[in-house]
Design a protein with these regions (language model features):
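Conserved catalytic core of the tyrosine transesterase superfamily
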Residues: 1-414
């Protein structure tokens, strides 16, 4: 697609040939006729509203937001245009991505000012090289640190000599209002990590600032780890009995979560070469501490993976074990897909109130190992906890062993 003439805005493109190029690209990425037609109708609707008498259309954030938030709410366009908000938003995001890929419109504007983006990159290098943060943790911390710096230094420049404890407290009072303790702790950990980075790399005096970061009222080991019992796990696994390629993939994914206690991003990162069929082991290369761990591969888990690879995995050049079965094809699944797999399985098996995401299956794996006689050290090795203190919480759900050491209630019968 060609950019329109110089009198138009930077996000303006010629309408001629746009729809044809758009649908052809979607077909090439594996989108089916129904999805392609729905997206095509949404883009046509946007063009008819945005540029009814022009040969160019502005594909910028402002007109897209007005179209979705204002026009679709009270649309009275003739015919049967695509009016679904979610479908329209997805269709226009795809259009922007396609046009940016061939330089028809400029790249998306950065989330933060340039000086903050540069600082975030320095922090990311430090976090990777020194701290060994998991990718998902680093992404979350970058977002919170970016918001922190944007609020603290709105005029540009990073002058920490001008920042005092009051500024820290005001940021948390505003940003974390109404947050649960766990969410506040995430923000606090991000800001604390960044200030320590400043002290190490730039010798900034941050002691008073660190002391001003609030401590969330969240006590370690205070709660019980939520897990599924054997009957609930059986119901969950029975929801994959349909001989559908995607269900076979999803079954293998959930077996990795239930049998090995893998995290969602670890399952997504598995590659074909990580499976040693001869020795029945699985190599996990993308853990939280950037270690390479070799885990035993249970027979039931290996069978589920082998069944998927031999019978259901689509032809692809990707070396990922688990790949997408819906457009965009020829790409590995990500943590979001795995969360969706678990939630859909929970809905099918009537466990919506009990199973909210993959991490509860990690708790279930640990609890099953404990009930099977494994020691806390063995569980810590499988879950790859760096400290036994992290694993100690599972001792609270071992009722058999707890009953053996329980003392009678004073003055009564236990």
């Amino acid at each position: 697609m060609s950019v329109s003439d110089s009198t138009a805005g930077p996000n303006s493109v010629k309408i001629s040939g746009l729809i044809e190029h758009y649908t052809k690209t979607l077909h090439g990425r594996g989108y089916g006729p129904l999805a392609t037609n729905a997206y095509k109708r949404a883009v046509e609707h946007f063009i008819a509203w945005s540029a009814p008498d022009s040969d160019c259309v502005e594909i910028g954030e402002a007109p897209i937001r007005r179209f979705i938030d204002e026009h679709l709410v009270d649309c009275s366009c003739a015919g049967r245009p695509q009016r679904g908000k979610v479908t329209t938003q997805s269709a226009l995001r795809h259009l922007q991505a396609i046009l940016r890929a061939n330089c028809s419109i400029p790249p998306a504007p950065p989330s933060f000012p340039v000086f903050i983006i540069s600082e975030l990159q320095d922090y990311s290098d430090f976090a990777n090289d020194v701290c060994g943060l998991a990718p998902a943790t680093l992404i979350s911390r970058r977002q919170w640190i970016g918001r922190f710096l944007t609020r603290i230094f709105p005029s540009g420049g990073l002058d920490f000599s001008q920042l005092g404890p009051k500024g820290i407290r005001e940021f948390f009072a505003t940003q974390c209002q109404g947050y649960q303790p766990g969410s506040t702790q995430v923000v606090a950990s991000s800001v604390r990590s960044y200030l320590r980075f400043r002290a190490l790399r730039h010798a900034d005096p941050v002691e008073a600032l660190l002391a001003a970061i609030p401590q969330a009222a969240r006590w370690r080991l205070a709660s019980l780890p939520e897990h599924l019992n054997q009957e609930e796990l059986a119901r969950l696994m029975s929801s994959f009995e349909q001989a559908d390629p995607q269900r076979q993939r999803d079954h293998a994914i959930v077996r990795c979560l239930v049998d090995l206690g893998l995290r969602s991003f670890e399952v997504a990162a598995l590659r074909l070469e990580d499976i040693d069929w001869k020795n029945a082991t699985l190599t996990v290369r993308v853990g939280k501490s950037h270690r390479v761990d070799i885990l035993p591969l249970p027979a039931v888990t290996g069978h589920a993976i082998a069944n998927y690879l031999h019978k259901a995995r689509p032809a692809t050049e990707s070396r990922a074990v688990f790949v997408r079965h819906r457009a965009p094809l020829d790409a590995p699944v990500d943590a979001g897909v795995i969360r969706s797999v678990v939630r859909q399985a929970a809905a099918r098996s009537g466990l919506v109130g009990r199973l909210h995401g993959p991490h509860r299956l990690r708790h279930s794996a640990a609890t099953r190992m404990l009930q099977g006689g494994a020691t806390l050290k063995e569980i810590a090795d499988v879950l790859r906890h760096r400290s036994l203190d992290t694993t100690a919480i599972y001792a609270k759900v071992d009722l058999t062993r707890l009953s053996a050491i329980a003392q009678p209630w004073p003055g009564g019968v236990s």
